[in-house]
Amino acid sequence: MKTKFCIEEENIYKPQLPDVMEAIFDAAYLIFDLIAAILFFIFSQGKILFILYGILTLTLCGGDAFHLVPRIIRTIRGTNDKIKRQLGIGLQVSSITMTIFYILLMYIWKFTFPELKIPVIIGAVIWISAAFRIVICMFPQNNWCTDEGNMKLSVIRNAVFA
């Protein structure tokens, strides 16, 4: 008695060259950023400006790693629901760390140009806007982990950067 086996072709993911190049760029960027942060700390000699540059660089690298590492994994293995969720959470974390990045940049500007004073109201507006943006980023209605997102909240949370 012959038995007929039905073998379905597996849908094997094969990365395309542009995707591989993007993954290489993303990995190189994260490595460069991490090395730059370490160098800022090593050579800071206790100078607050260079310590702030190191913190700024680590903030950028850390936030970007949350969405770039899943992108690199997606390039290598293909996509699935877990990767989509990691990318969504990564974009949310990156959005929050970018806000912190701009706050740190304000302090770097203050230390770089001590003769230029920021009016207290401007500093307050920047801090309030940053807090507002972070709160907006935390709303589940942003749909970070879905394909559709939320255009209205995207505009609101990014308007503070305008």
What is the predicted function of each stretch?
Residues 13-18, 150-154:
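Membrane-interface segments at the starts/ends of alpha-helical transmembrane spans
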Residues 19-37, 43-118:
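Early transmembrane hairpin module of multi-pass membrane proteins
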Residues 94-162:
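Membrane-proximal helix-loop-helix units in multi-pass membrane proteins
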Residues 1-16:
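Short, Lys/Arg-rich, polar N-terminal cytosolic tail immediately upstream
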